[in-house]
Swiss-Prot record:
Pfam families tied to this protein: I-set (PF07679), Ig_3 (PF13927)
Gene ablation phenotype (knockout): No visible phenotype. In a zig-8 mutant background, 74 percent of animals have cell bodies of ASI and ASH head neurons displaced either on the top of or anterior to the nerve ring. In addition, double mutants show defects in the positioning of the ventral nerve cord (VNC) axons characterized by axons of embryonically generated PVQ, PVP and HSN neurons from the left and right VNC drifting into the opposite cord (axon flip-over). Both defects begin at the L3 larval stage and become more pronounced at the L4 larval and adult stages.
An example Gene Ontology CC term for this record: membrane
Function: Together with zig-8, required postembryonically to maintain the position of ASI and ASH head neuron cell bodies and ventral nerve cord axons of PVQ, PVP and HSN neurons by preventing their displacement that could occur during body growth and movement. May act by reducing L1CAM-like protein sax-7 (long isoform) adhesion.
Lineage: Eukaryota, Metazoa, Ecdysozoa, Nematoda, Chromadorea
Disulfide bond keyword on record: yes
Protein name in the entry: Zwei Ig domain protein zig-5
Species whose genome carries this gene: Caenorhabditis elegans
Keyword Disulfide bond: yes
SMART domains for the chain: IG, IGc2
Length: 260
C-alpha cells in the first residue's frame, strides 16, 4: 500500500501533468535560489565522461558524447565554433518538489555530425549548467584526415538530409534516489521524421514490460519518464526506445533507491 508521502507525490505529479501535459518542459522555470539554499547536502555538477578529440575521413558520420554527474540534473548545450547547435533543458520535476535532498544522476548527451567536412570540422563544446552550481564544460576538436576528396567522399549530397535515423541525444543513464522519491529519467531524441519514444521496464529475467497503464510510471510528452517510488523497491531498470521509419535505437537506465 502506498505511503501518505507517496500518495501526496503522486497527486502532485498527476496535477502537474493534467495542467501542463501539452506544455513543453523547456518552459518549466529554473529552481529558485531558495531551493538550492535549502538542500541538506550540497548540489554537485562534474564531468563524468569528457569529450575526446577525433580525426576522421571527409564524409564520415560521427557522434560526440559527453556525460555529467549531477544533482540536480543539468541543462546541456552543445556549441560548434562558439555557435549553439543543440540544447536539452534539464529535468525539473525534482526541483519543483522543493525537496531538501535531491537524487544524483549521470546524464549523457550525444551530438551527431551527419557528414564531416570543412564546414562541420572544428571545436565542439558540451556545456552543463545547473541552478545550484557553476557551469562545467568539456571540448573536442574534430579534424579531417588528409586524403583526396575522391577517396574519402563528399558531403554535397547530404548537406541537408531530408531524413535521418533516430539518436538518443540526452539521457539519464543512472539515478540514485531516496525510497519513495520522484525521479525523472530524460530521454530526448533527434531524427527526421521526429522519432517516437516508448519506455519499458526491464524485469529481473531481462524481459521487457511496457510501463503503459502502470500507476507509478508516466511517459511525459517530451519523451522523459516520471517515476514515483513505492518505498519498497531497491532498484529498477528501464529502457527507452526511439523509432522512426529509418530505424530504432535504445538506451537503458537504472535507478537505485538508498537512504540518505
Amino acid at each position: 500500500m502506498p505511503s501518505p508521502l507517496n500518495h501526496h507525490l503522486s497527486c502532485f505529479v498527476l496535477s502537474v501533468i493534467l495542467l501542463g501535459s501539452h506544455v513543453s518542459t523547456s518552459k518549466i522555470p529554473i529552481a529558485p535560489q531558495s531551493v538550492c539554499e535549502g538542500l541538506i547536502e550540497p548540489s554537485v555538477l562534474s564531468i563524468d565522461k569528457p569529450l575526446e578529440n577525433i580525426k576522421a575521413n571527409r564524409g564520415d558520420s560521427l557522434v560526440l558524447r559527453c556525460a555529467f554527474y549531477a544533482s540536480p540534473q543539468p541543462t546541456i548545450v552543445w556549441y560548434h565554433r562558439g555557435k549553439r547547435v543543440d540544447s536539452h533543458p534539464a529535468a525539473h520535476f525534482e526541483t519543483l518538489l522543493s525537496a531538501t535532498n535531491l537524487g544524483q544522476s549521470v546524464v549523457e548527451s550525444a551530438l551527431r555530425i551527419d557528414c564531416l567536412d570543412e564546414r562541420t570540422a572544428g571545436e565542439y563544446f558540451c556545456e552543463a549548467t545547473s541552478p545550484c552550481t557553476q557551469p562545467v564544460v568539456t571540448s573536442s576538436t574534430v579534424t579531417i584526415n588528409k586524403a583526396p576528396k575522391s577517396i574519402t567522399g563528399t558531403c554535397k549530397s547530404i548537406r541537408q538530409p531530408l531524413e535521418s535515423p533516430p539518436i538518443v541525444s540526452d539521457f539519464t543513464l543512472s539515478r540514485i534516489e531516496l525510497p519513495g522519491g520522484v525521479a525523472q529519467l530524460a530521454c530526448r531524441v533527434r531524427g527526421v521524421p521526429t522519432p517516437k519514444t516508448k519506455w519499458f521496464k526491464i524485469e529481473e529475467d531481462e524481459s521487457l514490460s511496457t510501463i503503459d497503464g502502470q500507476p507509478n510510471y508516466m511517459h511525459l510528452s517530451n519523451g522523459d519518464l516520471l517515476i514515483v517510488g513505492d518505498e519498497e523497491t531497491i532498484s529498477e531498470s528501464f529502457r527507452c526506445v526511439a523509432s522512426n521509419p529509418l530505424g530504432s535505437v535504445h538506451q537503458d537506465a537504472s535507478v537505485i533507491y538508498m537512504m540518505a
